[in-house]
Amino acid sequence: MYSIVSTAIVRGIESIPIRVEADVTDGMPVFEMVGFLSAEVREARERVRTALKNCGYRLPPKRITINLSPAYVRKSGSSFDLPVAVAVLAAMGIIPKDRLEQLLIVGEVGLDGRIKPIHGVLPIVTKAAQERMDACMVPVENAKEAALVKGIRLFGVNTLEEVIKGFNDEIKFWEPEKEEIGHEKKVKRKEVPDFSEINGQQFVKRACEIAVSGRHNLLMIGPPGAGKTMIARRIPGILPEMTEEEALEVTKIYSVRGLLTESKAWMAERPFRNPHHTITPQGLAGGGMVPGPGEISLAHHGVLFLDELAEFRRETLEILRQPMEEHCVKLARLAGNYEFPSDFMLVAAMNPCRCGYYPDLNRCHCTKGMVEQYLKKISQPLLDRIDICVETKRVEYQDLIKENPHQETSAEIRKRVVAAMERQQQRFAGTNIRYNSRIPAALLTKYCRLSTKQKQYMESIYQKLELTARSYHRILRVARTIADMDGSDEILTRHLSEA
C-alpha cells in the first residue's frame, strides 16, 4: 500500500514543503529511505521502528520504502520522524489515509514513542497557513509557538500512541485554544536600566538619541570607566516598540535557533545582543553543519553591541561589512544557499589605545606607533559604515557629587525618538526606505535638500576635513535625522554643524 504525508523543512527562516511517500509491498524485509538525506534523517528509520515496537505495532516482514521529495532539496534534522511514522502506519492500513489530506505533520519521535519538540515550528506553520493547509500537527511543547499563526487549526500531540488513537477517533486531538496559548502579543515592557541613572555625559546621550532616531550605527571611544558600556545597555530603553510584522520576523529567527520557550513564545521586545570579543566568525554571522542564524541575525530589528571593538579578531569584524550594507546574511553551502535577515543597529565601544588612556600622557604609556597599530585593527571600510563616532570623556567630579540631579528618563527620550521616526515614516511612505540611515546616495538630493548657503558651508567642511563622498553622505543623513528631531522639514546649518 502507498501513502503520502505533508511535512516541511526550514531553510534560512523560510519553510520548504516536503512530501513523505511510503510504500509497503511484498518482497525482501527491508526498511529503506531515499531522497538526498542527511545522517540524522536516515537515523529516523531506527527511531521509528523502535518507537512503533514500544507502542505495540511491529513492522511487517515486507519491503518498506520511504521517499522524501523533492529530491534536489537536502533534508536534515529530526523533524521528519513523526511524518515518516505516520506515513508508514497509513501504508500499513493502521491509520486512514483520507485523514492525512491537507494536514502538515512535524515532530521528533523518541524510542519510547514520545513526541519531542523541534526547532523552526513558527516558519513552518506560517508557510502552511499561507498555502491554505487545513491543519498542522506539532509536538505539544511547540504548540504555544505555533498558535501565534492565525487561520489554521493546530493539533498538539504527546505520544505516537496518541496520534494513532486520534486518527482512529478513539480520542480527540488536543487543540490549543486562543486564550490558552496567548495570542495577545502586548506584554509589559521588560525592566531595563534608565538613562536618568547616568550623571553627566550629555554629549554622548545626545549622540545615542540621534543614532536611535535614525537607526544610525554608533561608535563610542573613550577611556575605561567613562561609561561606554553603561550607556549602551540603556539604549534598549529608548527604542520604539516593534510592529507586529517586525516581531514576527524576529520570532521566526529565534524559533529556528531554538531559543523560544513556552513562557516566551513571542519576541515582543527589540533584541539586544552583546557577544563576547572572543566570538568566532561563524558565531557572529551564523553557520554550522545545518546553517543557523548567528548573533547579527539574532539582533534583527534591534541592537548589536560590540564592547571592546578593537579586541575582536579582524576577520570576525570584516564579516559585518556585507550585512551592514545589505541587511541580510547570505551563506553558501553544498546543500544550498541560506539567507537570514540582519537589519540591526550597530553600537560599538572601544578604548583609544591598548592601555585605554590616550591622549592623557600622565596615564598613557603607549607610543604613537602602538596607538596607530591598535586603531588599525578597525578597517576603514568598516568605519565608513558607522555614521556617528563620539568621544566619551571621564565624568567630572562635580557631576558625580550632585545630589538628585535632574536627568531625563528613558521614557522622555523615547517619546522624542518615536516622534522623529513618525516623521520619517510619513516622508518615506510608499517607498522601501524606513529610516534616514537607509537613504540611498542617489536620493540624498531629494530628501536632504540644501540651500545655497548650506552648500557653501558643506563645501568648506568637505575641503577642510578632506572628507570622502561616503563621509559626506553620512553627514547629510545624520543632519536629516537631527532636523526630524527638531521638527524641521528643512535641514538647517545648525543641523549640519552638529552632524
Residue ranges of model-derived segments:
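Peripheral, non-AAA+ core regions of ATP-driven protein-machinery
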Residues: 1-219, 223-229, 332, 471-472, ...
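Short beta-strand elements
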Residues: 18-24, 284, 387-391
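Basic, amphipathic alpha-helical bundle interface domains used for macromolecular binding and assembly
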Residues: 37-45, 60, 67-77, 291, ...
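Catalytic P-loop NTPase motifs of RecA-like helicase/translocase cores
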Residues: 112, 306-313, 356
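P-loop NTPase nucleotide-binding/switch module
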Residues: 171-210, 214, 241-296
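Walker A/P-loop
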Residues: 220-260, 326
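Walker B catalytic acidic pair
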Residues: 301, 307-308, 319
